[in-house]
Amino acid sequence: MTYIRVSTMTPLAGREEETSQVNQELVDFYRTQEGCVSNHFVKAADNSGEQGRISFWSSERAANEAATQERSLQLRSRLHLLVRRGHQDRSFTVAAATTDAAVGSAV
C-alpha cells in the first residue's frame, strides 16, 4: 500500500531561500532511503509563498524509518526555525477505489 506524506509551510520573511534549500536537502536525502517511491519539493502556484514536500513511500514503516534518521531530524529541526507557526505534516494512504486511470480524467 502506498503511503504519502505532505508537509507544507510558509517561510519567515527573508528566510525563503534558506527554507527552500533545507527542503531540497530533505528531498534529496529521502530519495536515497529504502522504500522511497517518489519525493518532490513543491512551491505554491499562487503568491502565498508556501512551499513543502510531497513524498510517496512503499509503507508507513519505510517513511517512519527515514524520518527518524539523524540527518532527517537535523534538517527538520532547522526548518522549524525558518518557518511560520502552522507548519503542517499530513499522512495519507491511497484509497482502495483509486485507480491510475481515474487520475486526471474529466468528471
Name each model feature, range by range.
Residues 10-21:
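Short, surface-exposed ligand-recognition loops at beta-strand->loop->(often short) alpha-helix junctions
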